[in-house]
Structures are given as C-alpha cells and as structure tokens.
C-alpha cells in the first residue's frame, strides 16, 4: 500500500510539472523563432522590450485560446446532441435560466479558466456520447493552432509571422495540457474526465447526473426537489472514481440544504477519510461544510483550528467570491472570532456576490444558512 502511495505521489508530482514544461518549451521555441528576425543588434533596451512583448503576447494567446477551447466544447457538444446550459470565460458567465433566456452572470472556480456546461442527450443503447464533448476544446485548439501555423509559414520570419507562431504554439500547448489526462490545480482536466467516465457504467451515469443537476439549478430548481435517485451515495469502491465521488459531494450538499447537518457531517467525514477519487477543490469544499457544521454545533475551538489548515485557508482565499465560502467566513467571524464588525463586511461581500451569482436558488439556501448562524450567535449572547 505504501509503495503504491509513493508511486502515485511521484506520478502526481511529475504530472503537475507538465504544464510548466510545456510552456517552457513554448517560450524556448518562440525565442528561437524571434532570433531569426533580422532586426540588428537590439541592445539591452531592445531585449527588455522583446521580453515585455513576449509576455503580453502569451497572455493574449492564452486568453484567445481559452475562448477557443470552451467554444470547442460548445460546438462539438452541439454536434453530439448536447444542449446549451452555460458558458464561462474566467469569471464571465452566460447562462440559460428557467425562462430559456441567456443571462450574463459572474462566477469563478479555482483551477479553471473557463467552462462550458451542457445538458446531455438521451441515452442510446444505454450510452451517451462523451468523447467529442469533453475533448472538443482540445480539438478546436489544435485546429486553430494549425491555422496560425499556416499563416506563420506564409509570412515567414517577420514580426507578424512570429506572433502567429506564438499563437500556434500556445494553441497546441493548451490542447496538450487539457487533453493529456491529469489533475490541474485540484481539478480533473478533459482527458482525465474521459478516462473516468469510460471506466464504468456508474461513472457515465454520474457524469450525466452532474450535468443534469447543474442544468436544473440554472432553471431555479431547489436541489432538495430534484429526483432522490440522483443523490444516492455510491459505495466506497465506486467513489474511487472521481465522477462517482462527485455524486457523493452533491449528496452532502443536498443534506446540508435540507439542514440535516449531523447526517451530512458524518458522510463528509467518511468521504474525506476513505481512499477516493475526490478532486482537490471538492475535498476543500467538504472541509468548508464541516467547519460550518462544527460552528453551528458544538463549536469546539481545537476542532476548528485543525480544519483551518494552511491548505484550507489558501483554498478559501482563492474562492473568496464564492457565496458558500463567504458564508463560511461569515460563520467563522461571528461564532469563532466573535468579530461582528468583520462579519458585517463579509455579509456585504455576500450581497455583492449574490447580485451576479448564476444560481438564484443557491442564494436563497445560503441566506437561510446565514440566518442559522445569526440564531446561534444570538443564543450565545443570551447564555
């Protein structure tokens, strides 16, 4: 078991270096190409300008290819029979609501630059298409990269030509980073998702349910009113698959929404303890929920301190605009730090985030959970 854990850790550490290695190669290739331009002796200031232009070019190319990548999911998803649900680039999100209208909202998820969510088609022979939808982003990055490569070959070693080469290189790099199966920043990439879905019928069903739950949320359906069979907790063995483990997370979320806190906490503690396929951000999310449960329950200082690890604080800082994380921060300020002034500022942040949050029904649930914090604080004052 220990040897297996060491092997998995080495593999994880190596894969975490892959994106950096790919972009180091992009930088080296761009430097070689730029050196071919006949521009005389640039001098120190020329080199500084070159470096600044290169950094700016990389950012522009990444931004462009994030859009291309998510558009690829959309295009290949539509070709596979999927229906549009939401489209996000960084924190800018367009989502179809309960009336069928597409509205602009804001939401960011740590570890992701974008996301295109779609409603899967009905099963055919017990299966749904998953490869084109999941890998469509990488496919379109490659197509765009090849187009830029053709333009570079036509223009040669000119400034414009080399700029096109940079866009080609970043396109291919984006395709590789998303297509080579690995976990990035606590999130499974597209290639990893395809492998996870393909491992079992249960994993494929879990993938369908995830998309259906998110689509229902966008239509204003309360998670407690969705079909109960969607939230049946998979076995420990099944949850070794990341797709199935996500259903366990949804199950925990449903229990919390239903204010069954003790039941939810027991399940979350179990999921965090067993060997599972839980992705990093879901682990941190469950810890957030457990912190809340502890605060409104026994409120033991040593237990809360243990859960508020450096890693957990880092996650909460990265997700500081997420309404659930804001609610947890509010609970910490009121029930752990006893700092009402800080709590008021956090509550103002919640109201600001709520204005652009894509799922109105989640705002209602979060407000109710905040009220429970206030009730607990009031009881503490009386005592």
Predicted region positions:
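"A position-specific structural signal for the A-helix of alpha-solenoid helical repeats
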Residues: 250, 289-293, 324-335, 366-376
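Polar-ligand-bearing catalytic/cofactor-coordination segments
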Residues: 79, 115-124, 182-263, 269-275, ...
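Small-residue-rich helix-interface/hinge motifs
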Residues: 57-121
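Alpha-helical repeat scaffolds
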Residues: 225-236, 261-274, 298-316, 338-353, ...
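Hydrophobic transmembrane alpha-helical segments that form the core helix bundle
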Residues: 121-218
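Start-of-helix signal in alpha-solenoid helical-repeat scaffolds, especially tetratricopeptide repeats
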Residues: 238-246, 282-289, 321-324, 328
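Topogenic membrane-insertion module of multi-pass membrane proteins
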Residues: 2-58, 109
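Alpha-helical adaptor scaffolds
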Residues: 253, 257, 278-322
């Amino acid at each position: 078991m220990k040897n297996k854990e060491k092997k998995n850790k080495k593999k994880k550490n190596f894969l975490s270096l892959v994106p950096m290695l790919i972009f180091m190669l992009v930088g080296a290739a761009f430097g070689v190409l730029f050196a071919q331009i006949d521009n005389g002796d640039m001098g120190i200031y020329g080199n500084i300008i070159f470096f600044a232009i290169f950094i700016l070019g990389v950012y522009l190319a990444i931004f462009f290819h994030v859009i291309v990548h998510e558009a690829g999911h959309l295009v290949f998803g539509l070709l596979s029979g999927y229906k549009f649900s939401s489209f996000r680039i960084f924190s800018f999100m367009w989502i179809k609501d309960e009336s069928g209208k597409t509205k602009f909202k804001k939401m960011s998820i740590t570890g992701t630059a974008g996301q295109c969510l779609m409603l899967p088609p009905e099963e055919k022979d017990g299966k749904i298409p998953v490869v084109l939808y999941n890998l469509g982003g990488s496919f379109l990055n490659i197509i765009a990269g090849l187009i830029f490569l053709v333009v570079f070959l036509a223009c040669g070693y000119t400034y414009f030509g080399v700029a096109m080469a940079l866009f080609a290189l970043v396109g291919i790099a984006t395709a590789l980073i998303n297509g080579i199966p690995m976990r990035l920043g606590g999130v499974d990439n597209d290639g990893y998702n395809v492998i996870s879905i393909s491992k079992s019928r249960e994993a494929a069903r879990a993938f369908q349910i995830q998309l259906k739950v998110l689509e229902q949320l966008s239509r204003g359906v309360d998670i407690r009113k969705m079909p109960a069979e969607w939230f049946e907790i998979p076995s420990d063995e099944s949850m070794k698959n990341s797709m199935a483990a996500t259903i366990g997370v949804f199950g925990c979320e449903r229990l919390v929404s239903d204010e069954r806190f003790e039941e939810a906490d027991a399940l979350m503690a179990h999921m965090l303890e067993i060997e599972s396929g839980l992705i990093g951000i879901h682990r941190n999310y469950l810890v957030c929920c457990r912190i809340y449960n502890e605060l409104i329950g026994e409120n033991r200082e040593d237990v809360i301190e243990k859960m508020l690890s450096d890693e957990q604080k880092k996650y909460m800082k990265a997700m500081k605009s997420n309404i659930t994380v804001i609610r947890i921060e509010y609970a910490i300020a009121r029930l752990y730090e006893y700092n009402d002034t800080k709590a008021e500022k956090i509550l103002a942040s919640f109201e600001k985030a709520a204005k652009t949050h894509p799922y109105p029904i989640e705002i209602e649930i979060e407000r109710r959970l905040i009220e429970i914090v206030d009730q607990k604080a009031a009881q503490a004052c009386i005592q």
